[in-house]
C-alpha cells in the first residue's frame, strides 16, 4: 500500500470510529504534513482519494470537511488488475490536472484540443437564442433520454455511415464519460470482471475502481491495437461481463483498428456473450478521406454500447455526449435519473440550434485540417530537438503522439522535472496499473504552435539528454 493510501486508510478509520464527525473540519494540508511527517504531495493525494470515495468534501477557501454520510459508508476496496495488483494512478492524474489549470504551463499533457479551434461565437449565439425562447416545459422535454431533435440529429449521422439506430435507442448524457459510466453500470454488478486495454484511457480505470469492478488489462499494440489472441485467453479464463475499448484514435496510443479487426472483435465478444462498451469520442478526428466506422457497425446482436460526445470535436464546455444503448436504453435512463437527473437543458437546445445551421460539417473539415497541420509541425519539432534514442509513434488521426524513452529513463520522473520548467507531459503510468509503460508518455499536438511551444520542446530535449 502506498503512503497516501496508508494515510487515507488511517483517516477513514478515524472517521468510522467517530474521532471525526460529519461536518468536522479536517486539519489543513499543511497541518497534516506536520502531523503525519509525510510530504505535501502525499497528503494531497490522500485527501483527493478520500474525496473521490465520498468520505470528505472540499469547500473553496475553507478546507476539507467530513461528508455528512461518511460514517455510514462502507470501506471502498481497491480493485485488482491482476490477482495481486491494485489500481494506483491518482498521483499522475492529479499532477496532470493541476498543471493543466496553470496558464503558465505548456499543456502537452492536456487531454483536450485547443479551445480556440472551436466555433465558440456561433455556439454562444445559439445559446443566447434558445435562452430567449426557452419555456418551463423545456426542462421536462429534455429529461432522459434527452432532447428529441438532438437524438434525431445524432441518429441521422449514424445513418450517413450506413448504421441504423433509432432515436429511441439514444440517451443524451453529460459528456461521454457519463455515457461510459452508465453503460458500465447497466451491464455489470460489483465484483464483475471487465476487460480494458493496456494502456487505456485513465477514466476507465477510475470508473472500475468507483464501481468496485475487477479489471483485466489486455496487451495492446501501438499500431495494431488490442491483441485478439490475448483477449480470447482472458475470455476463456475469466467470467468477463464487459469490455471497454476505443477503436478509433485510441487514447493514448492513437491507433485506429482496421475494419477486419473490428469485425473480429465484435464476433469474438458476441461468442462469449460479453458486452462491448465502445468509447468513440475521437471518431471525427480522422485525417483520411472517409470517417472510420465504429465497431457498432458490425453489431448484429445488440451487444455494443456505442458512446461518444461533442466535447473533443465541437465544444468541451457544453458536456453533451450520448450512448446508442439499444436494449439497455431504458435501464440507462433510470440510472441517469438516479444520478445526474438529466443533461443541461439549455446546452441541449443550443446544440440543436447550432446543428440546424448546417455549419457543423464545415467546422469538422476545418478542424481536421488544422489538427493534421499542428500534429505534423509538433512531430517535426520533436524530431529536431529530442535525442535520436527517443522513438515517436505517429498515427494519422487525432492529436496525440506516443513517445518512448530509452532505458533506463522514467517518464514519470521526466514529467516532474519538466513541470519545474512549466512544461507538462502525460506519463505512461497514468494509463496503466503496471510498470511496462513507465518509459512512455503522451504528447498533445492540438495547441497552437508558436515560440513558446518550440522552446518547450527544445527544453524537453535537454532534460532527456541530461538523463541519457
UniProtKB/Swiss-Prot annotation:
The record's section on Pfam families has: Aminotran_1_2, GntR
Q: Name one GO biological process term.
A: alpha-amino acid metabolic process
The record's annotation in SUPFAM superfamilies points to: PLP-dependent transferases, Winged helix' DNA-binding domain
Which key words are in the record? Aminotransferase, DNA-binding, Pyridoxal phosphate, Transcription, Transcription regulation, Transferase
Question: Where N6-(pyridoxal phosphate)lysine occurs, residue numbers?
Answer: 312
- In this chain the HTH gntR-type domain maps to 1-69
Extract one GO molecular function annotation from the record.
DNA-binding transcription factor activity
- Please give the name of this protein: Uncharacterized HTH-type transcriptional regulator YdcR
Query: Which species does this protein come from?
Result: Escherichia coli (strain K12)
Amino acid at each position: 500500500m502506498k503512503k497516501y493510501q496508508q494515510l487515507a486508510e488511517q483517516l477513514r478509520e478515524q472517521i468510522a470510529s467517530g474521532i471525526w464527525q460529519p461536518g468536522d473540519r479536517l486539519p489543513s494540508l499543511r497541518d497534516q504534513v506536520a502531523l503525519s511527517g509525510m510530504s505535501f504531495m502525499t497528503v494531497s493525494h490522500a485527501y483527493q482519494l478520500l474525496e473521490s470515495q465520498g468520505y470528505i468534501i472540499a469547500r473553496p477557501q475553507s478546507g476539507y470537511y467530513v461528508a455528512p454520510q461518511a460514517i455510514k459508508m462502507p470501506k471502498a476496496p481497491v480493485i485488482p488488475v491482476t490477482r495481486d495488483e491494485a489500481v494506483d494512478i491518482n498521483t499522475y492524474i492529479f499532477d496532470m490536472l493541476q498543471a493543466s489549470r496553470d496558464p503558465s504551463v505548456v499543456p502537452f499533457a492536456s487531454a483536450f484540443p485547443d479551445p480556440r479551434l472551436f466555433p465558440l461565437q456561433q455556439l454562444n449565439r445559439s445559446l443566447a437564442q434558445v435562452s430567449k425562447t426557452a419555456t418551463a416545459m423545456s426542462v421536462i422535454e429534455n429529461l432522459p433520454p434527452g432532447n428529441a431533435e438532438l437524438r434525431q440529429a445524432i441518429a441521422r449521422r449514424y445513418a450517413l455511415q450506413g448504421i441504423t439506430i433509432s432515436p429511441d435507442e439514444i440517451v443524451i448524457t453529460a459528456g461521454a464519460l457519463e455515457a461510459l459510466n452508465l453503460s458500465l453500470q447497466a451491464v455489470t454488478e460489483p465484483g464483475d470482471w471487465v476487460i480494458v486495454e493496456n494502456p487505456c484511457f485513465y477514466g476507465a480505470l477510475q470508473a472500475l475502481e468507483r464501481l468496485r469492478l475487477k479489471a483485466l488489462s489486455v496487451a495492446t499494440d501501438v499500431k495494431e491495437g488490442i491483441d485478439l489472441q490475448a483477449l480470447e485467453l482472458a475470455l476463456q479464463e475469466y467470467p468477463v461481463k464487459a469490455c471497454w475499448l476505443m477503436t478509433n484514435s485510441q487514447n493514448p496510443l492513437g491507433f485506429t483498428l482496421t475494419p477486419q479487426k473490428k469485425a473480429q472483435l465484435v464476433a469474438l465478444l458476441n461468442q462469449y456473450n460479453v458486452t462491448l462498451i465502445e468509447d468513440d469520442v475521437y471518431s471525427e478526428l480522422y485525417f483520411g478521406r472517409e470517417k472510420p466506422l465504429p465497431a457498432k457497425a458490425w453489431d448484429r446482436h445488440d451487444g455494443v454500447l456505442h458512446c461518444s460526445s461533442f466535447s473533443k470535436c465541437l465544444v468541451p464546455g457544453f458536456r453533451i455526449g450520448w450512448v446508442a444503448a439499444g436494449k439497455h436504453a431504458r435501464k440507462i435512463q433510470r440510472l441517469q435519473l438516479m444520478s445526474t437527473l438529466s443533461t443541461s437543458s439549455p446546452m441541449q437546445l443550443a446544440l440543436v440550434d447550432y446543428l440546424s445551421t448546417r455549419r457543423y460539417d464545415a467546422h469538422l473539415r476545418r478542424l481536421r485540417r488544422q489538427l493534421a497541420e499542428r500534429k505534423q509541425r509538433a512531430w517535426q519539432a520533436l524530431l529536431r530537438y529530442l535525442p535520436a534514442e527517443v522513438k515517436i509513434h505517429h498515427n494519422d488521426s487525432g492529436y496525440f503522439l506516443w513517445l518512448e524513452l530509452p532505458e533506463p529513463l522514467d517518464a514519470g520522473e521526466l514529467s516532474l522535472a519538466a513541470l519545474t520548467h512549466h512544461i507538462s507531459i502525460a506519463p505512461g503510468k497514468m494509463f496503466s496499473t503496471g510498470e511496462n509503460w513507465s518509459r512512455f508518455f503522451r504528447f498533445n499536438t492540438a495547441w497552437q504552435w508558436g515560440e513558446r511551444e518550440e522552446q518547450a520542446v527544445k527544453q524537453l530535449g535537454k532534460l532527456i539528454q541530461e538523463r541519457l
